[in-house]
Amino acid sequence: MKKYLAVLIASLLIILAGCGPENGTAEQTTKAASLNAISADEIDTTVGKSDQDAAYDESSATKITLTGASASISGNGASQKDGVVTIQQEGTYLVSGTLENGQLVVDAADTEKVQIVLQNVSIDCSDHAALFIKQADKVFLTLAEGTENTLSSGSSYALGDDDSNVDGVIFSRADLTMNGSGSLAVNAAYKHAVVSKDDLVVTGGQYAIKAENGGGLYGKDCVKITGGAFTIATGTDAIQANNAEKADQGYVYISGGTFDLTAGTDAVQAETVLRIDGGTFQITSGGGSANASIDKSGKDSPGWGMWGPQSEQNPSQDAESTDTSDSAKGLKAGASLSLRGGTFSINSSDDSIHSNGTVTITGGTLSLKSGDDGVHAGDALLIEEGTIKISQSYE
């Protein structure tokens, strides 16, 4: 314990509420902060066997071969019209080939589960989501071993009354799990890369995500990641859960994986609880600590706080988030932030680690460079174990 205290005394700057100014970009009061949010021990960290199992029966699956402007289908449960392939029944669907200015849609019963296996797929949709999960109970997006897959969308969407909130290259109104060992590149020119309006679970795969005007991996109710390799470059948040209406939702749980995150605003943001048990993280947010709150002369930096593109940070929803300004934190939670393991290298314009409520560190190795606070807890801070080094901070 003494060695941890020594590290803290030598290199840790910790700001608690009332101990330092928050400048003009202070955390705004959010619904999440006023909720009696559950603790980091109480969130649902369960990841089911089906989420982790990327196996499939090729002999019984429906095969969809994309052929440029159309598709051929062998099996039941899917149809094609004018470059739009629609999956309508529960089952496993093997998808291969290229679709130019087309779309893959899931519109099954809300009690049905669908597995989509990508086998060297390229889909580009100029004016809508490349993969639109309109309805289902749950969809498993499996990246077949040894395959390279790409989903892209254009810079503007043509939306109607029934799809006015669609804002991702992958957009799901059902629970979405991404697994397998293949690779997936997601290129978002409009807003976000991957959006689930329910749970978003990732258990494997290699992901290269670019979203200049939006975010990377967004799950409304929660984001759970147990494995995978992620390179994410975004204009807003790289990973986010944003349900502020329910105390047991809006959380992010990560237990493993490698993460190279470059975010215009927050790198990982949870409306309620952010819990990380393991993983390797290389994080840059808001341009990094060089974009600091205080300039070299000791004066407030006039441009500090102008992070991200001039567009909404959160995926389209019914005004669930009440933040009135963006932030550019490394790790951010609305109620509780718990670090229990992992290796972190965080270079942030804003606070490197921030919670409006509590911060608990019981493990992990942290190397922090901050343009504002190193670690900020609005209510309480507990450090029991771990190695923490802050080489730069301004408050």
Question: What is the predicted function of each stretch?
Answer:
Residues 5-395:
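A composition-driven surface/loop motif
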